[in-house]
Design a protein with these regions (language model features):
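N-terminal Sec/ER secretory leader and immediately downstream segment
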Residues: 2-92
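Short acidic-hydrophobic surface loop/beta-edge motif
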Residues: 22-27, 136-138, 168
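Glycine-centered tight beta-turn/hairpin loop motif at sheet-sheet or coil-to-beta transitions
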Residues: 27-31, 143, 172
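A mature extracytoplasmic/lumenal domain signature
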Residues: 38, 151-154, 179-181
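Short, flexible beta-strand-to-coil junctions
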Residues: 60-62, 88-90, 140-142, 179-183
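Short, surface-exposed coil-to-beta transition loops
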Residues: 68, 131-132, 158-163
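Non-cytosolic head/periplasmic domains of membrane-anchored proteins
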Residues: 71-153
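Long, compositionally biased interface segments
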Residues: 158-207
């Protein structure tokens, strides 16, 4: 039957879709416009009001799922990298970069370890609730800080995405990005790409 073929097709996709239809999702006062093949969960692929939106995209072009890149989206192509992103109402008054001075810096000891990629790594204290975690800090061209939180070396192999970074976008949204630490080799490109993707996705960006 037609219905049976449609359901079978969905199952063969493994929960992914190659449908590029744009959905408009409203979270609070913000409107997000996203293609269905970038939306991670089938139940979120609809227009309307939501409390959260979860996305995934192929680095570096931020493409959604297609038959051509099926292996990458099924974690079966080690040469391709997925970034996972979530949008939800802000729960903190500052994003990760904004938390560096008032929060993270109060926990850090010493000057940290300067890495070849230009970032400085600081281990976060376990007694503050951080287990096998560090923050990596970089200086942007405008003098502001790039901050990411990562699993420390040796623990990373247990996680598909070893680092995360959140930024404030729109009127009242936070975008959390999760990605492998290998992308920090060119962290400035990553930083710009995440901001550009947010600007493209959130249609109520604060001037």
């Amino acid at each position: 039957s037609l219905i049976g073929r449609e359901i079978g097709g969905r199952l063969s996709m493994g929960g992914h879709t190659d449908d590029a239809t744009i959905h408009e999702v409203v979270i609070g006062n913000d409107v997000l416009a996203v293609s269905a093949n970038r939306i991670r969960y089938p139940e979120q692929r609809r227009d309307g009001v939501a409390g959260r939106l979860d996305l995934y995209a192929l680095w570096p072009d931020m493409q959604g799922f297609s038959e051509e890149n099926r292996l990458a989206f099924n974690n079966a192509d080690a040469s391709k990298v997925l970034i996972f992103l979530s949008f939800e109402p802000r729960s903190l008054s500052r994003d990760m970069s904004g938390r560096l001075a008032p929060i993270y810096s109060q926990m850090l000891k010493g000057s940290g370890e300067l890495l070849p990629n230009g970032l400085t790594r600081h281990e976060l204290p376990a007694d503050a609730g951080f287990v096998d975690e560090s923050i990596l800090v970089g200086q942007r061209n405008d003098g502001t800080k790039f901050v990411a939180r990562c699993l420390i070396p040796g623990a990373e192999q247990s996680a598909a995405a070893g680092c995360d970074r959140d930024i404030h976008v729109g009127d009242d949204l936070a975008m959390m990005a999760r990605f492998p630490s290998s992308l920090l080799d060119d962290w400035k490109t990553l930083d710009l790409a995440l901001s550009a993707f947010a600007a493209q996705t959130v249609k109520t960006m604060t001037p």
